[in-house]
Structure formats: structure tokens, C-alpha cells
């Protein structure tokens, strides 16, 4: 028999396992490594997401930052001061003399321009850093619902429900108001004034308009709680409570 034809030629056949897929243990390790990498990326994303959510919740329900943009509350609050405003004080617990931040768009009949989605998003991000909306004002509560407030009494002081009151937060020698007024605050409304009476566009500036410059309780964002900037003025803000006066008509 021809030795060259004795059997099939196997010299070109691959060895067992040659060219086959990698062992299953290697595949499992690769998959595990991939899952670990994905989980790690998710953790990196989850942390900032949770932090952002916490900030949003705190700002919406507890405290919100606010920067002082004007001189209307000098000398109590200066331009550039940064505050934390407590949102936990309901309107019926607001007292005379409290410093509050409120949305003045309704009370002061402000023209609010239409804003697109992108602009609203930018404003939302800026608000987290303490930049308020153009319609957010900070003033001192002078008249509560039902109060009779007028300026000025015979001795030149502000008068609430027939009682001339001392305002320790005004600068020395400052007049309570160069604009005379005599108002009765409606239910669920507040009469607001800035401490820098000569440079404050407050309730007095809107006497002849619909609503008479009275701020609805529902528009009060919160009560000023603490100043966190600048550091040399860090601390609580003196609310300068007005002395107790009787209710109107008592």
C-alpha cells in the first residue's frame, strides 16, 4: 500500500482548542469589571444628584439665600450682604419690625417680562447662589393686617394704632418718612418700608395704585435669619422689633 495514501493528512488540522473562544472564566471577569466600572460611574453621578436635590429641597421649604442689591435697607443691611432667609415662618406669625423678603410683582404692580425656558433655568441656577429674582424685595414689616399706620405724629414719629413708635433701626437724625401717609392695612396684607427711608421704593411709593402697596401674606417668601457674608458681619440680623402697640380700635 502506498504509504502516502495510508490515511488522511492531519498535519494542517488545528490542535484541540486552538482558535476557540477565551475560557469562560476570563469572560466572567471582563463582565464583572465592566459592571464595576458602570457602578462606579453611577456612584459619581449619584453623589452630585443627591446633593443638588438636597439643596433644592432646603431652598424650597426651609432656607433660601438672598443677596442685598440696593441701599434701601441701610444701615441694617448693606449692598453685597448675603443672607439666609427662613421659609418656616408663616404669615400669621410675622411681627412688626421683622425683616422679610417678598415677591413684589403683585403688590407693587411690577412689569414682569416673559421668560423662556433657558432663561428660567439660568435664573434657577443663579438663585441657588443667592441671586434673587428682580421682583424679590427685602423690607421691614411696619403694619400688620388691621393696623392703622400714619406718618407722622405730632412729634414727627411714625404712628401705629394711635401710638407714636420709636424706630431704633433708622439712622441718627433720619426722618420716618418725607412722604405723608395714612393707611389702614387690609386683612392678610402687610405695610412694608425700607430702613433707608429716603432711598426705598416701598409700600409708600404705590399708595395710588391698585392694592395701595399692601403686600399679601402669600407673597412673603421668608424672614431674614442670618447674614453669612461678609465674614466680619457674620451673624444674626437684628430685627429691631417695634414696641408693642394695641390693636386698631382698642
Model-derived regions: residue spans:
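Soluble "head" domains of membrane/secretory-pathway proteins
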Residues: 2-42, 61-67, 75, 79-250
Amino acid at each position: 500500500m502506498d504509504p502516502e495514501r495510508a490515511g488522511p493528512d492531519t498535519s494542517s488540522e488545528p490542535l484541540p482548542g486552538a482558535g476557540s473562544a477565551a475560557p469562560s472564566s476570563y469572560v466572567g471577569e471582563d463582565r464583572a469589571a465592566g459592571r464595576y466600572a458602570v457602578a462606579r460611574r453611577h456612584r459619581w453621578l449619584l453623589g452630585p444628584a443627591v446633593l443638588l436635590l438636597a439643596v433644592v429641597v432646603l431652598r424650597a421649604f426651609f432656607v433660601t439665600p438672598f443677596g442685598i442689591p440696593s441701599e434701601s435697607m441701610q444701615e441694617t443691611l448693606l449692598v453685597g450682604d448675603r443672607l439666609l432667609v427662613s421659609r418656616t415662618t408663616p404669615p400669621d406669625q410675622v411681627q412688626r419690625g421683622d425683616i422679610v423678603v417678598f415677591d413684589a410683582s403683585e403688590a407693587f404692580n411690577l412689569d414682569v417680562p416673559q421668560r423662556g425656558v433657558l432663561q428660567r433655568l439660568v435664573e434657577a441656577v443663579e438663585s441657588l447662589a443667592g441671586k434673587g429674582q428682580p421682583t424679590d424685595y427685602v423690607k421691614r414689616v411696619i403694619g400688620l393686617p388691621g393696623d392703622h399706620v400714619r406718618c407722622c405724629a405730632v412729634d414727627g414719629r411714625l404712628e401705629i394704632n394711635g401710638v407714636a413708635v420709636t424706630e431704633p433701626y433708622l439712622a441718627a437724625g433720619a426722618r420716618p418718612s418725607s412722604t405723608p401717609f395714612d393707611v389702614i392695612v387690609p386683612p392678610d396684607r402687610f405695610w412694608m418700608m425700607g430702613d433707608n427711608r429716603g432711598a426705598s421704593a416701598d409700600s409708600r411709593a404705590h399708595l395710588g395704585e391698585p392694592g395701595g402697596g399692601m403686600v399679601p401674606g402669600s407673597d412673603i417668601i421668608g424672614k431674614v435669619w442670618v447674614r453669612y457674608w461678609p465674614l466680619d458681619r457674620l451673624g444674626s440680623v437684628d430685627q429691631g422689633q417695634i414696641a408693642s402697640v394695641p390693636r386698631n380700635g382698642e
